[in-house]
Structure formats: structure tokens, C-alpha cells
A protein has these predicted regions:
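Non-catalytic C-terminal accessory region of glycerolipid acyltransferases
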Residues: 1-8, 98-283
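Short hydrophobic helices that act as membrane-entry/anchoring signals
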Residues: 6-24, 77, 81-84
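Catalytic core of membrane glycerolipid acyltransferases/transacylases, capturing the structured
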Residues: 12, 36-93, 100, 125, ...
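Helix-to-loop junction immediately C-terminal to a conserved catalytic motif
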Residues: 14-46
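Short, basic, glycine/proline-bearing loop/turn elements
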Residues: 15-16, 82-89, 195-201
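Structured helix-beta-strand junction loops
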Residues: 22, 37, 82-83, 107-108, ...
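A generic local structural motif
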Residues: 26-31, 50-52, 72, 98-99, ...
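Residue-level "edge-of-site" marker
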Residues: 32, 93, 230
Length: 283
């Protein structure tokens, strides 16, 4: 099996990578963790459309990202196709996409995916977004509300934790309303005050992971390379950084739940390191 669109991918990686680095000036840590050959699955958190750029500019290898079919059928579909993306229909259990990905891995190529399965941002999730806005609709215009969500990068996983804490009466309704639009700061404060456990805090950092990455790694012998991006996709003072973690293998006899938890722990570790470096002014 020969990779398609290799020349187009290299051209766009060079062009897009140039402007990406020029505009965002990301700090990339431990890119040497990406093997130069053999089947690999790059597994990252998902906070922005440009998340895949970090991996793409960190290796000479072509990385085939799995992307929802709407991206490939939209006005920039040509770009996603030339970038080697695999079209995924999220409305069904897309066996064609899965088989294509497995085929690539079995031939020793590189796959990229986001094991959370979706972007972890409240402003882009209609159901969560509308429910949260009910708390503020009498005080904040909707456009301003969305602007605040984007500026503070309020994550769905953070709101999920706040919902649980409210239900368990670990926080009050007033605290929820006063802090939901800056959830990460509030959750960190709760941890410092020992009102929540470290495990609860960890739950706020990522959405629950899907089994796809560890399942494909087990079936093909591919190595999983975790990568986590923290900071903001803005022009100045963004503290944008991505760090690659320890490689993960999933032996044939390993329980997939155990493998998924292993991947999650490594991704959480990387995110904590990124947040710590930002807080300490290292990035």
C-alpha cells in the first residue's frame, strides 16, 4: 500500500507550518519521542481546529488524521484530502474509516487521532452551551458570553465536573454560577483548598477517552505517542505549548480498559506539566 497525496501533504505542511509557527510561536517539547519508522498513533487532546499542526510540524513523517466527514465535504475539503485525512462519518459506526486506518498502520504508516472523540470546548457544543447560558442570559448578551467562553477556554470536561460537584453538594449554586465561565481557575482553587481530590481534578482535564486508539494499537502492534497542547491559540501571550509523552504499547493480552487508563494517565500527566510550566512562567 502506497501513501496518497504525499507531495501535497509535504507542500501544505511546509506552508501551513511556516505561518503556524510565525503566528502562534508554539513551544514544542520532546518531539524526539516520535519514531522515525514503524506504525504509530499520535494521540492528542482536542481544544482547537489546529491541534494536529503540532504533530505535523514535529516529524518528517506523513500523519493521517481522522477527521469528521463534514470537514472533507466542506469548502476546505480539498485541503483536508491533500493533508491525508481519513473521512469519518460520526453518525454511524464507520467501518470503512476504521479499516482504512488499520490498513495504514499495518503498512507501517502514522495515524493521528483525538481519543476524546470531539473538541473539548463548551462554546462549540450546542447542548452544553445552551444549558450553561441559561444561567447568564439575563445578564450577558450571547455574543459576549461566547467571547468569554473562548477567551477562558472553558472545557466541557470542566463543566461536567462542576455538575457532579453541584449534585454532590460540594459546591453551591451560587459558586457554580459565579465561577463556571472561568472554570479552570475555580477548579484549581477547589483543589488548593482540598475541597476536591486530585483524582477529581484530573477528571476536569480531559473528556472520557474512547477505545479506538488502544484497540487499533493492539490489533496492529502500533506504538501510541501521546501529545498534549496547553495554552491558547491567540497571537500574543498565548503560552502555547505541546509536549510529547512516553510511548505506549498495547500487548495482545492487555485489557483495553487498562490500556485506555494508561493512555489517559499519561495525557493527564503531560497536561499538568504544561499547566505548571505556564503558571511558573517557564513558557
Amino acid at each position: 500500500m502506497k501513501e496518497e497525496h504525499v507531495h501535497g501533504y509535504r507542500f501544505f505542511r511546509t506552508v501551513v507550518g511556516f505561518f503556524y509557527k510565525l503566528y502562534y510561536k508554539p513551544t514544542i517539547i520532546n518531539k524526539e519521542a516520535i519514531p522515525k519508522e514503524g506504525p504509530i498513533i499520535i494521540c492528542g487532546n482536542h481544544i482547537h481546529l489546529f491541534d494536529q499542526n503540532t504533530a505535523c510540524i514535529s516529524t518528517d513523517r506523513m500523519i493521517h488524521y481522522m477527521a469528521k466527514k463534514e470537514h472533507l465535504e466542506g469548502p476546505f475539503g480539498w485541503f483536508f484530502k491533500l493533508s491525508g485525512c481519513i473521512s469519518v462519518n460520526r453518525e454511524i459506526h464507520d467501518e470503512n474509516a476504521k479499516n482504512h486506518a488499520l490498513d495504514l498502520l499495518n503498512h507501517g504508516y502514522a495515524l493521528g487521532l483525538f481519543p476524546e472523540g470531539t473538541r473539548n470546548q463548551v462554546w462549540g457544543k450546542e447542548e452544553v452551551n445552551k444549558k450553561l447560558y441559561e444561567l447568564y442570559k439575563n445578564k450577558i448578551p450571547y455574543k459576549k458570553y461566547i467571547k468569554i467562553l473562548k477567551a477562558n477556554q472553558v472545557c466541557v470536561s470542566e463543566i461536567m465536573l462542576l455538575d457532579i460537584l453541584l449534585e454532590q453538594k460540594k459546591i453551591t449554586k451560587e459558586e457554580y454560577k459565579d465561577n463556571a465561565l472561568n472554570a479552570s481557575v475555580f477548579i484549581e482553587k477547589l483543589l488548593e483548598e482540598k475541597r476536591i481530590t486530585e483524582e477529581e481534578y484530573d477528571e476536569s482535564l480531559l473528556l472520557p477517552l474512547k477505545f479506538g486508539a488502544v484497540s487499533m494499537a493492539q490489533k496492529t502492534g502500533a506504538t501510541i505517542i501521546p501529545v498534549i497542547t496547553t495554552g491558547k491559540y491567540v497571537f500574543k501571550n498565548n503560552h502555547l505549548n505541546s509536549r510529547f509523552g512516553n510511548p505506549i504499547k498495547v500487548p495482545a493480552d492487555m485489557n483495553l480498559e487498562e490500556a485506555k487508563e494508561l493512555l489517559r494517565k499519561e495525557m493527564v500527566r503531560l497536561k499538568k506539566e504544561g499547566l505548571k510550566d505556564i503558571k511558573e512562567g517557564k513558557i
